[in-house]
Curated annotation (Swiss-Prot):
Homotetramer. It comes from the Eukaryota. Highly expressed in trachea and epidermis. Detected at lower levels in spinal cord, bone marrow, brain, tongue, esophagus, heart, colon, testis, placenta, lung, skeletal muscle and lymph node. Belongs to the short-chain dehydrogenases/reductases (SDR) family. This is Dehydrogenase/reductase SDR family member 9. Gene3D superfamilies: NAD(P)-binding Rossmann-like Domain. GO terms for biological process: 9-cis-retinoic acid biosynthetic process; androgen metabolic process; epithelial cell differentiation; progesterone metabolic process; retinol metabolic process; steroid metabolic process. The gene is DHRS9. NAD(+) binds at residues 34-58, 83, 180. It comes from Homo sapiens. 3-alpha-hydroxysteroid dehydrogenase that converts 3-alpha-tetrahydroprogesterone (allopregnanolone) to dihydroxyprogesterone and 3-alpha-androstanediol to dihydroxyprogesterone. Also plays a role in the biosynthesis of retinoic acid from retinaldehyde. Can utilize both NADH and NADPH. GO terms for molecular function: alcohol dehydrogenase (NAD+) activity; all-trans-retinol dehydrogenase (NAD+) activity; androstan-3-alpha,17-beta-diol dehydrogenase (NAD+) activity; androsterone dehydrogenase [NAD(P)+] activity; oxidoreductase activity; racemase and epimerase activity; testosterone dehydrogenase (NAD+) activity. GO terms for cellular component: endoplasmic reticulum membrane; intracellular membrane-bounded organelle. Its EC number is 1.1.1.209, 1.1.1.53, 1.1.1.105. Substrate binds at residue 164.
Amino acid sequence: MLFWVLGLLILCGFLWTRKGKLKIEDITDKYIFITGCDSGFGNLAARTFDKKGFHVIAACLTESGSTALKAETSERLRTVLLDVTDPENVKRTAQWVKNQVGEKGLWGLINNAGVPGVLAPTDWLTLEDYREPIEVNLFGLISVTLNMLPLVKKAQGRVINVSSVGGRLAIVGGGYTPSKYAVEGFNDSLRRDMKAFGVHVSCIEPGLFKTNLADPVKVIEKKLAIWEQLSPDIKQQYGEGYIEKSLDKLKGNKSYVNMDLSPVVECMDHALTSLFPKTHYAAGKDAKIFWIPLSHMPAALQDFLLLKQKAELANPKAV
């Protein structure tokens, strides 16, 4: 009996693996739209999918980002300047994309644009500190999706939302984590709403990667700027050396940071080209081995492990 059970499990594993490797036949007639292509995941994705033969429409925030990307890609790739927080800009871009793709529609929408905002303890922050990452990471993503969705439905294509392990675990204070938690919720409701239309919706949850988004120097600079504005009471609670201790903790976590961005793009590739795309992708060894498993653990264990990564306060009772 045990032999048959093991045999059945092995067969199921083989068929599941085989299923994941089945690909769409032709990509050379398919259009994809990617946001946040100035640098990082979006830039690498645009270059990678251009080489594969997709008709890539890459949205950049800056003219310099657009120019640099066009210099590294084929004439087939198109760029457009896009601020995802500007509703009129998004509407104009969607109309322009509609004219580009014609009756083929849009096979892939990759919502990648994002910002970290201020990553600092909650009691250091104001409502405005929360606003920027939520405007870009959540409302910007929703705005682009709503405007591009008719084109994706026409092609019975794919929507790929780049979230984060920060959408599964509250690793840091600030607006980044709430924005990514909300992206996860939007992604799941969209996936169920689009199923009847033959549109597949996937969510990618990268771990810690070395990108402009996670530049520790910029993180510390923003913390220092906020520190200067804090009340004497809060400064006393945290202590003058708190930021330096936080920096030491960041340096100690370098081993967790993925230097190679390609795992995220590989997830995008599978979500775009597989006949059976996954609903969720964990990108990076740290995401697969630590962050995602931890997100399923009891809150007490999460708190214990995550609090060990935080710098100690000088005098938390000074309130």
